Amino acid sequence: MTSKKVIRLFGICVALLLFFVSAPQIHAQHAAAAATTTPISVYGAWACSNDACIWGTVRSVSEYDSQNHWLVDRGDGVPSVNLVVLSFVQPLKLLNKTNDAQTVNGVPIGMTQDIVNYFKSHNIRVMLSIGGITYASDWDQALATNPTQLGLNAAAVAQQMGVGIEIDYENSSSPNLTGLQAFIDAYRSQEPYDPTGANPAARLTIDLAAGDRWLIPLATKATTDWLTTSNPVLDYANAMVPSRQPSTSSAESNWQEHVDGKPQYSPPIPPLAPAKFTGSLYISDTKSGLPPECTTFTGSLINTTGSYVQSVAPNGAGTTSGMLGYMFWAAECPSSRGTCTTPPNSCTGGVGVGSSTYNIPVPMPPLRQS
């Protein structure tokens, strides 16, 4: 046998040895990766009615269903979502229990018990969102006036209607965090934190920016004091949509900022457990018609970010991998200028197919706590 043949044979033997040694390790790594994939729990939509989120008219259930049926039926009788957040309640009106042409006891007249029950009859959880960017100054005024009473009023509405409450306070520079703490304390005095999720009125959440570079004081306070896994005060946060629909990499980069925190900031923003927040995508309110996230699941961000959302690992907070899920902005007509999700349009092809693809549980199950 020539020396070249000996060398070649030796090389083959080494290659085979390396294959048999590394193959089990590779298999184990893939198995570990599969084991850390967590199913989506929260798959919800903000609902804006037909008047850019004012909810200023009373609507019959049949008329409302004719415009929004895709939410409760993705085509096979199963809802497209397991959460609907009726948006928005004006905080100052809620504090004052205002009654006017568009408001009753501080709540928009369109947010009726009939509409709430319409969703609940399909096992869809319902929440009311207080605030939004339009009402940021109203949040400021209400918190400066009587934040405790605002929290008590919010809890009373939640109890009466059987809904949860979402805090959407978008003061980016100088939020009244002392007032917001008093609001939360008052709410929790009536509705203590419920890890089981069985009590709808105990569900209290907050909206944060897409990443950690906007609403910085709010993110710092919320992540430090309200969204910890050791002493949770709020159930979870929604990482809101950015100014426009992101790319896959941009969306994941934004969400990763919450997971990593911002230790370089002063004060630092600590890491947020993946199990303590959702990521948000546009399904309407875009300039050029409805996006694929509404109409076409394949290739949409619901599709391309799915692996990340279900598997992102904790980085300093929490013990389980995967975010809670997705929120979608927004059903029906969030803007007077954009395209609505109403007939002949529908989001069954995007959100609905995503619901089926990810086997979204309806009703929403108890949420991971860490």
Regions found by a protein language model. Give the residues of each.
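Catalytic-core region of carbohydrate-active enzymes that cleave or remodel glycosidic bonds
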Residues: 302-312
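Chitinase-like catalytic core of GlcNAc-active glycosidases
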Residues: 34-265, 271-304, 320-323, 332, ...
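Bacterial N-terminal signal peptides
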Residues: 11-21
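Short, solvent-exposed mixed-charge patches
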Residues: 366-370
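Glycine-rich phosphate-binding active-site loops on the catalytic face of alpha/beta enzymes
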Residues: 326
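Sec/Tat signal peptide C-region and signal peptidase I cleavage site
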Residues: 24-32
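Bacterial N-terminal signal peptides that target proteins for export
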Residues: 2-11
